[in-house]
From Swiss-Prot:
Pfam families: Ribosomal_L2 (PF00181), Ribosomal_L2_C (PF03947). GO terms for biological process: cytoplasmic translation. The lineage of its organism: Eukaryota, Metazoa, Ecdysozoa, Arthropoda, Hexapoda. This is Large ribosomal subunit protein uL2. Gene3D superfamilies: 2.30.30.30, Nucleic acid-binding proteins, Ribosomal protein L2, domain 3. Residues 210-231 are annotated as: Disordered.
Length: 257
């Protein structure tokens, strides 16, 4: 009988879970309170820091507590153009400037927004990776809904009361720089999770992977498997509707002409 394959081991967690010990904290918007619902609250950017394992930088923003004589520290995902010492305004009556947090219903059509709430009060769920942004497409004042275009290109209808940060997430173009050597890849994934180096199944022994073994590296059987396949065999193209090249596309048409 073969061994427990890599996919089964990853499903159990253990050494494959994310490394969060050195993370700076969970970057979120402020908790929705009376000040944000009816006016605005002012904060100041104290520092912009690097979060290990995250491509986007984080901004440390200090707010005065509206009810107690104390300062509240918040961690925001830094948009492009934010700087230390900048004043950040959060609330319904905030102005449309980079770094400010306001409801998407108060933003004009075409506004670039990031760290967008999916549900009211969840403190930011969408468009959070480096270089990502969503675009406000249109509003429906009667239904109090706003249509936005997500980084994937999908269009989503959200409540107009959902908050978002104006601007593009900083760190864009990060993946354009080539890694060039294995040492950099090692350090990149060391702070993320145990997923590197990635060994191909055909390069393994038959006891370790269904694609392993043989006098030369080849799968030796159909790589498509059904959805209900047992866990130790469920590798390759899982429940594929079709395989192979997509013929008749733009690239094929250009070659023919």
């Amino acid at each position: 009988m073969g061994r427990v394959i890599r996919a089964q081991r990853k499903g159990a967690g253990s050494v494959f879970v994310s490394h969060t010990k050195k993370r700076k904290g969970a970057p979120k918007l402020r908790s929705l309170d009376y000040a944000e619902r009816h006016g605005y609250i002012k904060g100041v950017v104290k520092d912009i820091i690097h979060d290990p394992g995250r491509g986007a930088p984080l901004a440390v923003v200090h707010f005065r507590d509206p009810y107690k004589f104390k300062t509240r520290k918040e961690l925001f995902i830094a948009p492009e153009g934010l700087y230390t010492g900048q004043f950040v305004y959060c609330g319904k009556k905030a102005t449309l400037e980079v770094g400010n947090v306001m409801p998407v219903g108060a933003m004009p059509e075409g506004t670039i927004v990031c760290n967008l709430e999916e549900k009211m009060g969840d403190r930011g769920r969408l468009a959070r990776a480096s270089g990502n942004f969503a675009t406000v497409i249109g509003h429906n004042p009667d239904a109090k809904r706003t249509r936005v275009k997500l980084p994937s290109g999908a269009k989503k209808v959200l409540p107009s009361s959902n908050r978002g940060m104006v601007g593009i997430v900083a760190g864009g173009g990060r993946i354009d720089k080539p890694i060039l050597k294995a040492g950099r890849a090692y350090h990149k994934y060391k702070v993320k999770r145990n997923c590197w180096p990635y060994v191909r199944g055909v390069a393994m022994n038959p006891v370790e992977h269904p694609h392993g073994g043989g006098n030369h590296q080849h799968i030796g059987k159909a790589s498509t498997v059904k959805r209900g396949t047992s866990a130790g065999r469920k590798v390759g193209l899982i429940a594929a509707r079709r395989t192979g090249r997509i013929r008749g596309g733009k690239t094929d048409t250009k070659k023919e002409t």
